[in-house]
Amino acid sequence: FTFVIDKLDQDETGNALNSASALAREVRQVVIPEVDTYTYNKMVTGAGTKPDAITLTKDNIYTEIIKAGNALDNAEVPETERVLVVTPDVHLLMKQCADITMETDIGNDMRLKGVISNLDGATVVKVPAARMPKDFGFMLCHKVATVAPTKLEDYKVHQDPPGINGTLIEGRICYDAFVLENKAKAIYYQANKPAV
């Protein structure tokens, strides 16, 4: 990416528009979402266990998540460092599920803090639906299954380059993600069939 902050614009905003904040915003709002979207799509595509899509509800969400945990257990995936990736809509279902909120230690913690952060030994990570494939339900995974190398990540800020009265900001990031074939069973992906 490349963009310019003109000196006049910077001056008129009382220095609120400056190169450091603009670069940080670009990384936060563009680069990170793009890399996340790419990596999550690779993980979903390469998941070793993908049962048929079902309609997730507050009544079945807990059962489906512990089924995923059972599948990872049977595939001999380490129990530590598992991550449950959910969208805000699925997280809402989890909060509405009596099996989670009323009958578990997690429920006690949630009532105190108002958030579900761990379920069935997995850290719960809520990711915006826009970064996930269409009809994403949830994904239970372990870090051994995916590698996401960043080959190059370089950002430059040039003050008054030729032809520009201001700051030229450039960034370049080269990345990829791979699901290791022999570790694919460490990813369980459940698609969510929209309710009719």
Enumerate the language-model features and the residues they cover.
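Short amphipathic
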Residues: 1-4
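Alpha-helical scaffold segments that mediate packing/assembly in large oligomeric complexes
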Residues: 7-75, 188-196
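Sequence/fold signature of self-assembling virion shell proteins
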Residues: 14, 97-196
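Residues at beta-strand starts and edge strands
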Residues: 21, 80, 163-167
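Residue-level marker of positions within ordered structural domains that often coincide
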Residues: 32, 89, 174
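Intrinsically disordered or highly flexible coil/loop and linker segments, enriched in small
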Residues: 36-40, 78-81, 178-179
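Extended, solvent-exposed, turn-rich assembly/linker loops in the middle of proteins
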Residues: 47-115
